[in-house]
């Protein structure tokens, strides 16, 4: 069996935990945002269709809309015209940041950029913090190897 060119999912759990901690999102919220990212515009039925797969929360749509993760693209006017929504700039940035981290960008380790590096954090945050440091070290080594291989080819 041929292995993929890049091992994108190796640190998926660490990246997901970091994004949830940084942006105050739950697992279900993040899953829905990732699903809706490929949908340019969506209606409430589209949202509810995917929301059936994640943990149940009555007001999830309203909450995500109020918190600025979803914005109204077009208001519904009358019985035949339904409202359309789109992911906000904030939600789009989160998804793009996830892709960048999966492609090898390092997770920041400064106190101002990463809440898991504060002093008064949970044990879980400390465990993930150590894994972030390992992941960043791995990504640096991987980039160094790629650079030296490229120099050898030239």
Question: Where is each model-derived feature located?
Answer:
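Short, cationic-aromatic polyanion-contact patches
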Residues: 21-26, 75-99
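Terminal interaction helix/tail motif
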Residues: 112-143, 150
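Short acidic, hydrophobic short linear motifs in intrinsically disordered regions
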Residues: 39-51
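Short, locally clustered residues in the helix-turn-helix/winged-helix DNA-binding domain
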Residues: 34-38
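A short, conserved structural fragment
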Residues: 65-79
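Short alpha-helical segments that sit at the start of domains
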Residues: 2-32
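Short, amphipathic alpha-helical interaction segments positioned at domain boundaries
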Residues: 89-123
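Short amphipathic alpha-helical interaction segments
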Residues: 52-67, 82
């Amino acid at each position: 069996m041929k292995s993929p060119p890049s091992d994108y999912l190796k640190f998926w759990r660490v990246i997901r935990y970091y994004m949830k901690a940084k942006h105050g999102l739950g697992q279900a919220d993040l899953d829905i945002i990732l699903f809706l990212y490929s949908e340019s515009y969506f209606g409430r039925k589209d949202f509810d269709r995917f929301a059936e797969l994640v943990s149940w929360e009555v007001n999830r749509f309203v909450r995500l809309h109020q918190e600025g993760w979803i914005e109204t693209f077009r208001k519904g006017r009358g019985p035949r015209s339904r409202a359309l929504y789109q992911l906000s700039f904030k939600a789009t940035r989160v998804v793009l940041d996830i892709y960048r981290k999966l492609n090898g960008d390092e997770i920041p380790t400064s106190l101002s950029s990463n809440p898991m590096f504060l002093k008064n954090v949970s044990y879980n945050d400390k465990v993930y913090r150590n894994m972030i440091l390992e992941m960043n070290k791995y990504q640096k080594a991987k980039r160094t190897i790629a650079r030296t291989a490229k120099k050898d080819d030239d």
